[in-house]
Curated annotation (Swiss-Prot):
One of its GO terms (cellular component) is cytosolic large ribosomal subunit. It comes from the Bacteria. GO terms for molecular function: mRNA binding; structural constituent of ribosome. Belongs to the bacterial ribosomal protein bL12 family. This is Large ribosomal subunit protein bL12. Gene3D superfamilies: 3.30.1390.10, Single helix bin. Keywords: Ribonucleoprotein, Ribosomal protein. Forms part of the ribosomal stalk which helps the ribosome interact with GTP-bound translation factors. Is thus essential for accurate translation. Pfam families: Ribosomal_L12 (PF00542), Ribosomal_L12_N (PF16320). GO terms for biological process: translation. CDD domains: Ribosomal_L7_L12. Homodimer. Part of the ribosomal stalk of the 50S ribosomal subunit. Forms a multimeric L10(L12)X complex, where L10 forms an elongated spine to which 2 to 4 L12 dimers bind in a sequential fashion. Binds GTP-bound translation factors. Coiled coil: none annotated. It comes from Chloroflexus aggregans (strain MD-66 / DSM 9485).
Amino acid sequence: MSKIDTIIEMIEGLNVLELVELKKKMEEKWGVTAAAPVMAMGVAAPVAAAGDGAAAAAPAEEKTEFDVILKEAGPNKIQVIKVVRELTSLGLKEAKDLVEGAPKPVREGVSKEEAEAAKAKLTEVGAVVEIK
């Protein structure tokens, strides 16, 4: 096993707080910063909050955006397609392709309430749905 592989395995075994400490020490040692590019600022915000210690780590783990994933259409595929069209404003062909290509996301980055409402509508017509 190479040195790189050994290092990767060691890093995989670290928890979040240990990773934050490692990042800080690497920045201090080599005078670099691990700042994310401007386009990835939505991803960088939770990492920055976790760097403030264990107290800040708990709020950073609370999820505010959810994805509604259609796992399986179930027996009432036509009804599921109608609900998918209602939820997404997709055309008939696009909604049919989404339903037939399950598992696929129906809604992404929505609030918990919207995700629960979408899941309820889809499960009501027999679809198998997961919220991530």
